[in-house]
A protein has these predicted regions:
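Phosphate-binding/catalytic loop of phosphoryl-transfer enzymes
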Residues: 522-560
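Conserved phosphate-binding/catalytic loops in two-lobed NTP-binding clefts
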Residues: 490, 505-517
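Active-site-adjacent structural elements in enzyme catalytic cores
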Residues: 117-504, 546-549
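Glycine-rich phosphate-binding loop plus the immediately following alpha-helix
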Residues: 278, 284, 387, 464, ...
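Hard-cation-handling environments
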Residues: 498, 554, 589
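Intrinsically disordered, low-complexity, mixed-charge
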Residues: 3-202, 206-213, 226
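General small-molecule cofactor/ligand-binding pocket signal
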Residues: 99-101, 386, 509
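Two-metal-ion RNase H-like nuclease active-site motif
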Residues: 40, 429-436, 532-539
Length: 589
């Protein structure tokens, strides 16, 4: 029941009378199916507000990753509603109206948000993890707000998504927040369709949500958010290496201006030469001021740093900065990033200076996510740990981008940028899983005309990478409700991914390493004209059983001819040359 003066009601003649003696408006109804990025971005509350603004009745619900809407009211109001559904969508939403069909009018007196449904087929889209929005940052820094300095503040426009979803539909019981019971105040926000935290599944506050804890190797402990933060800052100021749990796993943090701290981190990890990323303070009013004191950023690089993924961006270092020369030895570029979670904002703003922020792992492995595992495996690396008790369902390392020819190019996909969903320019006859190469592994699932790429996993020469690799393959199929019927793998017979493909029992298709690289350079919409592609990429198994390196390939994806290459030479150590280039240099001397 509703109020007919505020919510248009049906009469027996399917008309709306707004004033006595006026011509009734004919009531119509439509059913809409909306796909795209509509999960975890506040889309249903937006639909509710839009419908009530236009005086429409009906309902909206989630169904396995898509949104279904029934609206009823004046025809012109429904037309405007459909237009604004796309034009005024929340900033992080990417809605697409897949179907809009006439529906029977019925006894609908108000607009409601219904419980999610798992019935029927759907076009599932899994949301990535989202950086902290400006509204939450304002509350985080407002002493009058009940979430002041709360490290896990979030709303429908920000917070973890992919790394806490256990299954779909995206509802709180299906996430790692299921174990945190909402307090009365949070529950009131969660159930209020006009609140920006309506059905914000990671919703929490200091009274009912996750909390921090600190422990160091010397026995120092601190419980409670503020005490743990103070202890962490003190450890960093003392030159310690601290493992800090974020959204997709742990970082190893240390003072970016201390040669001694950075050297200790390199020796312990061990990571003797590879560059390390640096995280900078980012006050809401001027988020780029600090980083611009240290690096030169082109306009597109600035946009990248502030983009929703909040990636690591490669940038040219300014001369004479106080950053440690051990961060990127021998290079004039460093990877810079901004805080992406409330916890990182608090740490960087309290510390007041840049911090090295590298993945907390054993080099080459996926980032660690479990509190106990970090305590055990990084005891010789980290002097202290800043834990929290919100479980991370799956690891997601930081994404890495650089600007090439004024265009953002991913070097590594990860937290905030994945799952990366793409449309294919063709239709697949059966679902396919592509399992990637041996180094810097990533996997992809494709079906119909859709493609989903996983986060970066790591090098496949260790047990943990293989375990995460297998978990990722299972997760993608489970989350998207798709079972692969064919596997595509690298042609190299010795790769762990090839051996997995052999054990899978699925029909297999092997692809030469350099053929795969060549295919990525092609514009599939350019027709059948042949491409000449130069693939200069370390070593890869070739058609003749040798290890290829610099190749010139002519053709198009699926049909390549090797028309030129570097002169073959003996390779001391075989594939070790891919990680130790001096071996190639020695071979040609």
């Amino acid at each position: 029941p509703g109020n007919c003066t505020n919510n248009p009601c049906l009469t027996g003649t399917n008309a709306i009378d707004t004033e006595l003696g006026t011509t009734p408006k004919v009531v119509t109804a439509r059913s809409l199916t909306v796909t795209g990025r509509v999960q975890g971005v506040g889309f249903r509350p937006f639909v509710y507000r839009l419908a009530t603004t236009h005086g429409l009745t009906g309902w909206v619900l989630n169904r396995l990753g898509q949104v279904e809407i029934r609206v009823q009211g004046a025809a012109d109001a429904i037309r405007l509603f459909e237009h604004e559904l796309i034009a005024l969508a929340p900033p992080l939403a990417r809605p697409q109206i897949d179907a809009s069909t006439p529906a029977e009018t019925g006894q609908l007196y108000e607009f409601t948000i219904r419980e999610s449904s798992t019935a029927g087929a759907a076009s599932i889209h899994v949301p990535p993890d989202l950086f902290t929005c400006n509204d939450c940052l304002h509350e985080l820094n407002d002493p009058a707000d009940r979430r002041y300095r709360y490290p896990f503040i979030n709303c429908t426009q920000c917070g973890p998504r992919y790394t806490l979803i256990r299954s779909l539909p995206y509802d709180r019981p299906n996430t790692t927040m299921a174990g945190f019971t909402l307090c009365p105040q949070c529950l009131a926000e969660y159930t209020n369709p006009t609140d920006r935290r309506f059905h914000a599944e990671p919703l929490a506050c200091p009274a009912c949500g996750p909390a921090l804890s600190f422990a160091s190797r010397d026995g120092t402990t601190a419980g409670g958010n503020e005490a743990a933060l103070r202890a962490c800052i003190a450890a960093l100021r003392g030159g310690d290496v601290v493992a800090v749990k974020g959204i997709g796993g742990y970082h190893l943090l240390c003072d970016a201006g201390s040669n001694a701290a950075v050297t200790r981190l390199r020796q312990r990890k061990p990571r003797p030469h590879k560059p390390l990323a640096v995280m900078f303070p980012a006050p809401p009013a001027s988020p780029l001021d600090a980083v611009l004191q240290y690096v030169i950023l082109a306009p597109e690089a600035r946009e990248l740093l502030l983009s929703p993924a909040r990636p690591i961006v490669l940038a040219t270092q300014r001369p004479g900065t106080p950053l440690s020369g051990r961060i990127a030895p021998g290079l004039n570029e460093i990877g810079v990033m901004l805080p992406y979670s409330p916890l990182h904002h608090l740490l960087l703003n309290d510390y007041g200076a840049p911090l090295v922020a590298t993945s907390a792992n054993i080099s080459g492995e996926p980032v660690l996510t479990d509190n106990r595992e970090v305590d055990e495996r990084l005891a010789h690396v980290a002097d202290a740990c800043l834990h929290h008790d919100r479980p991370v369902e799956r690891p997601a390392d930081d994404p890495v981008y650089r600007s090439i020819c004024n265009t953002a190019r991913p070097i590594r996909l990860g937290r905030g940028a994945t799952p990366q969903e793409e449309s294919l320019p063709f239709h697949l006859p059966q679902p396919v899983i592509a399992v990637g190469g041996h180094m810097k592994n990533t996997v992809a699932l494709a079906w119909e005309s859709r493609l989903v790429v996983s986060p970066h996993i790591g090098d496949m020469g260790n047990a943990r990478s293989l375990a995460v690799f297998e978990q990722t393959i299972a997760d993608l199929q489970s989350l998207y409700g798709v079972t692969a019927e064919r596997v595509i793998h690298d042609a190299h017979p010795g790769y762990a991914t090839t051996r997995w493909a052999e054990r899978s029992g699925l029909p297999r298709h092997a692809v030469l390493h350099h053929h795969a690289h060549a295919a990525t350079a092609c514009d599939l919409s350019a027709g059948d004209a042949p491409w000449l592609v130069f693939t200069w990429d370390g070593v890869g198994y070739g058609a003749d059983g040798t290890l290829w390196g610099g190749e010139a390939l002519l053709g198009h994806p699926g049909n390549w001819e090797r028309v030129a290459s570097l002169r073959p030479f003996h390779l001391p150590g075989g594939e070790r040359a891919g990680r130790e280039p001096w071996r190639s240099a020695a071979a040609v001397c």
